[in-house]
């Protein structure tokens, strides 16, 4: 009897087969500028000058590799905004399609408000805490129906966090009397509006003047919005202490 009681006190258990449990991940919309100015060759990849878009494309595809478990969609915008890929867990397909996108696909101007509005439309029915937008532009809003801050106000009410990125160098290379010279570039990026959008929605504004800064920015966003649904494996456990306890009770009754 004492041996059975000791066995019961040890709380024997039976563990079933491991079961995979998924927790909820982010619903992340990448909103990317493909207006005409994204052809400006002021970024560098692998030691060679490239267009802004080429750098953004490469960095965004690298970013996707770190978001396994999230649903990611892409909106491209220029004069118009359109849903390029809907929210999906198939990040390989998103990356492949992103590699095929190019400047001018949505017109030459910049409809920031419409692009953000479209991102909100495609996340409207999703849980607020899971919705994140990363909006990148190299210009100022000069097209579209919705104003950027109107869209930001809607995002705020819907609980959508918006990170904004201004992309483009501060200088431009021009030929002078003594060869090529770096000259200050005009204020192409409407940084004030991008900052306001981020502040209103609880996000952050970042400025990328070169490829290295762009990589760092997307790494920062990746850290700020960690993937929440790393798979967890658990084994269902059934308590068996009652078996020796019942046996000890039965023996004590019979021996009485």
Locations of the language-model features?
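C-terminal signal-anchor/stop-transfer transmembrane helix together with its immediate cytosolic
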Residues: 1-20, 227-256
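An amphipathic, basic-hydrophobic helix/alpha-beta surface used to engage anionic
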Residues: 1-29, 34-61, 65
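Extracytoplasmic
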Residues: 23-29, 58, 67-72, 82, ...
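Soluble periplasmic/extracytoplasmic beta-strand elements of cell-envelope proteins
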Residues: 27-37, 55, 62, 71-77, ...
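Short beta-strand-loop
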Residues: 40, 68-101, 117-126, 173-191, ...
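Second-shell loop/turn segments in exported
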Residues: 42-50, 60, 81-84, 100-108, ...
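VWA/integrin I-like adhesion module and closely mimicked acidic/polar interface patches used
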Residues: 107-110, 121, 130-132, 139-200, ...
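Juxtamembrane amphipathic/hinge helix adjacent to a transmembrane helix
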Residues: 208-240
């Amino acid at each position: 009897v004492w041996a059975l009681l000791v066995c019961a006190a040890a709380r024997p258990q039976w563990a079933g087969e491991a079961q995979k449990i998924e927790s909820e991940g982010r619903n992340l919309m990448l909103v990317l500028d493909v207006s005409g100015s994204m052809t400006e060759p002021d970024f560098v990849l692998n030691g060679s000058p490239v267009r802004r878009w080429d750098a953004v494309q490469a960095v965004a595809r690298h970013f996707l590799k770190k978001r396994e478990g999230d649903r990611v969609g892409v909106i491209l915008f220029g004069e118009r905004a359109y849903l390029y890929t809907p929210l999906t867990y198939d990040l390989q397909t998103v990356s492949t399609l992103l590699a095929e996108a190019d400047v001018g696909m949505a017109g030459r101007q910049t409809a920031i408000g419409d692009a953000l509005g479209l991102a909100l439309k495609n996340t409207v029915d999703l849980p607020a805490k899971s919705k994140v937008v990363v909006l990148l532009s190299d210009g100022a809003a000069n097209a579209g129906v919705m104003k950027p801050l109107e869209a930001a106000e809607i995002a705020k009410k819907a609980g959508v966090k918006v990170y904004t990125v201004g992309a483009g160098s501060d200088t431009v290379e021009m030929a002078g009397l003594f060869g090529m010279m770096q000259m200050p570039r005009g204020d192409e990026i409407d940084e004030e509006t991008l900052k306001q959008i981020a502040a209103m929605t609880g996000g952050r504004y970042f400025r990328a003047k070169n490829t290295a800064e762009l990589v760092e920015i997307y790494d920062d966003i990746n850290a700020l919005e960690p993937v929440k649904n790393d798979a967890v494996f658990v084994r269902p456990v059934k308590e068996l202490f009652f078996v020796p306890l019942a046996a000890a009770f039965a023996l004590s009754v019979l021996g009485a």
